[in-house]
């Protein structure tokens, strides 16, 4: 939905991989000053969980973030060449391998390839006209969406040159407007409706 809105888009590192925050970094390996603030000491871990080096290659010691061994030059003399490189500044959990770029790159259904397709469509379909028109299917479902009891619903809007974004936050599948589906973030229901927490981009008929 964010990429369908007017204006610039901001993608935080790892978002394009579907990478979760690393919430269990040991206290003695944190770097964020928030974790060591006298008022919050060992109460709030700060932002380091979102700053862990990205996984590029699943089968390497640092998931491709840095070389496995040192190479001569740039502060490394011949006697150090071949030694193991230092660990990354923040620890990478083993489950990072499941989100590595080289794995997602070859998976047509991965989050990485979804982002690539969305960015390509954004470039193709978005114009300088920032007009956004709410569609009739933009509505509250009147039912909790599962997120702390909030009422869910559908957010749907039309962009200037005839395409629309529909996101279903409601508990029940939502009907889609007529048109050709350009992109969908997850499978539709058997009868073609949009499930909860799923977005579709549609070239309106």
Where in this protein do the model-derived segments appear?
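C-terminal beta-sandwich/jelly-roll accessory domains of carbohydrate-active enzymes
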Residues: 169-205
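Buried hydrophobic-core signal for structured, non-transmembrane domains
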Residues: 164-168
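Loop/helix patches that line or flank the sugar-binding groove of alpha-linked glycan CAZymes
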Residues: 1-163
């Amino acid at each position: 939905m964010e990429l369908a809105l007017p204006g610039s888009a901001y993608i935080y590192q790892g978002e394009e991989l579907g990478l979760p925050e690393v919430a269990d970094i040991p206290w003695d390996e944190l770097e964020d000053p928030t974790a060591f603030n006298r008022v919050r000491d060992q109460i709030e871990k700060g932002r380091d969980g979102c700053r862990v080096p990205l996984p590029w290659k699943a089968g390497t010691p640092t998931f491709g973030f840095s070389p496995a061994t040192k190479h001569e030059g740039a502060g490394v003399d011949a006697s150090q060449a071949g030694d193991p490189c230092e660990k990354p500044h923040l620890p990478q959990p083993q489950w990072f391998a499941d989100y590595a770029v080289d794995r997602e790159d070859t998976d047509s259904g991965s989050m990485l390839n979804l982002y690539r397709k969305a960015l390509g469509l954004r470039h193709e379909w978005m114009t300088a006209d920032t007009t956004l028109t709410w569609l009739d299917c933009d509505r509250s479902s009147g039912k909790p969406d599962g997120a702390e009891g909030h009422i869910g619903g559908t957010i749907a809007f039309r962009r200037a040159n005839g395409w629309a974004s529909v996101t279903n936050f409601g508990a029940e599948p939502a009907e889609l407007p007529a048109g050709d589906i350009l992109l969908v973030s997850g499978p539709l229901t058997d009868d073609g409706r949009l499930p909860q927490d799923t977005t579709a981009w549609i070239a309106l008929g």
